[in-house]
């Protein structure tokens, strides 16, 4: 324990000294050779720390009763081992140098990432309301994610919950009410008030704001057999089939829409993903932070699909995902994402680089 503690403290001091020296030599943080040496030395320390820790553990085991090799055996084998160790160290440094150049060249903010405001900008209005839509547009979100339910008379309204009690104070389900009974009902969330809009009304306002929508279908189980066709027809009637994206927890509905209306971009929302993605006829996957790993992005891209991540609100997590090859970040805080993006593009000190390399 004391050995690793001393090694850790020494390493921290060395890393801080390296960061300081690199910052003095390259104040802009853009000199490729200084960056390469910086990264190689950091990785070399991590490698040596791992080796020394294992050697320390081995030493404790030997002290507790293992019989060490004789002095003559050690002497005859020593020179060959030292040569081999030298060659391996040299190869390691060369490999790390190449990897460092590659990492530094690719460790850039992904400027293609779409910012998706989750149910609008909910810090400025009731979720899924026109006010939340308008607030998200002011924050220059790429898309607004919103939820739609089918009423008893087979029309679409904008609402997340199956039951209206949480927002409207009415203990009734949307599936048991007609369109005219739902649209216009007052809703309240925190200090904000609004009313339930129809899907068409929401789309028309989004068009006025030049805001694209990510439409989540929320099937409640009592939809007619032609549910997918009802949605497709509505998207086409409103003239947004090729502009908007849609997603759902129900894979079968998404695959039906993909089959019947390939012009509509479809996504499968996966609450918890273990292992690789299963074979799915959709255009993108939507996963939460816990399930995310880089191999999933590689798999999706190899299949010509995209990956969206939800719901990312923590600034550190937002910063992390800005460097990933994902298509979109879904967040309740579009204001934070834009701020973090500007910060990451601007700040390139060696402390920033060290943090990104460790955290990403």
Region spans (language model):
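Juxtamembrane transition segments at transmembrane-helix termini in multipass membrane proteins
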Residues: 3-98
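Conserved, mostly hydrophobic/aromatic
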Residues: 118, 136, 147, 182, ...
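Metal-dependent phosphodiesterase/phospholipase catalytic core, i.e.
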Residues: 160-265, 287, 301-303, 357-359
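Long, acidic (Asp/Glu-rich), low-complexity accessory segments flanking structured domains
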Residues: 68-124, 170, 180-194, 353, ...
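Short, acidic/polar
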Residues: 125-135, 199-202, 226-228, 268-278, ...
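C-terminal active-site rim and adjoining tail of enzyme catalytic domains
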Residues: 267-360
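Membrane-interface segments at or immediately adjacent to transmembrane helices
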Residues: 103-152
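Structural preference for beta-strand elements that scaffold enzyme active sites
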Residues: 112-116, 143, 212-214, 243-246, ...
């Amino acid at each position: 324990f004391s050995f690793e503690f001393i090694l850790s403290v020494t390493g921290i001091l060395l890393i801080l000294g390296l960061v300081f020296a690199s910052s003095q030599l390259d104040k802009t943080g853009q000199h490729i050779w200084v960056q390469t040496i910086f990264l190689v030395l950091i990785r070399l320390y991590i490698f040596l720390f791992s080796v020394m820790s294992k050697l320390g553990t081995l030493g404790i085991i030997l002290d507790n009763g293992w019989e060490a090799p004789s002095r003559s055996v050690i002497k005859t084998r020593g020179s060959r081992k030292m040569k081999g160790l030298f060659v391996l160290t040299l190869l390691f440094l060369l490999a790390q140098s190449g990897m460092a150049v590659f990492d530094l060249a690719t460790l850039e903010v992904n400027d293609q990432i779409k910012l998706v405001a989750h149910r609008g900008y909910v810090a400025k209005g009731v979720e899924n309301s026109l006010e939340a839509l308008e607030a998200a547009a002011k924050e220059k979100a790429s898309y607004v994610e919103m939820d739609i339910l089918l009423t008893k008379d087979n029309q679409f309204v904008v609402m997340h919950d199956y039951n209206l009690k949480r927002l409207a104070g009415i203990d009734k389900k949307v599936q048991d009410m007609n369109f005219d009974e739902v649209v216009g009902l007052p809703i309240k969330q925190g200090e904000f008030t609004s009313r339930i809009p129809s899907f068409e009304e929401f789309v028309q306002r989004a068009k006025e704001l030049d805001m694209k929508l990510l439409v989540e279908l929320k099937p409640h189980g009592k939809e007619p057999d032609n549910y997918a066709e009802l949605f497709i027809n509505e998207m086409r009637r409103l003239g947004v089939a090729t502009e908007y994206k849609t997603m759902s927890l129900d894979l079968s509905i998404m695959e039906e829409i993909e089959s019947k209306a390939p012009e509509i971009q479809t996504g499968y929302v996966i609450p918890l993903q273990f292992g690789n993605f299963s074979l799915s006829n959709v255009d993108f996957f939507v996963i939460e932070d816990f399930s995310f790993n880089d191999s999933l992005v590689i798999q999706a891209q190899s299949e010509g699909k995209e990956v969206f991540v939800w719901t990312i609100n923590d600034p550190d997590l937002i910063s992390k995902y800005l460097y990933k090859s994902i298509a979109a970040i879904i967040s309740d805080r579009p204001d934070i994402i834009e701020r973090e993006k500007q910060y990451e593009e601007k700040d390139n000190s060696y402390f920033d680089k060290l943090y990104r390399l460790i955290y990403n």
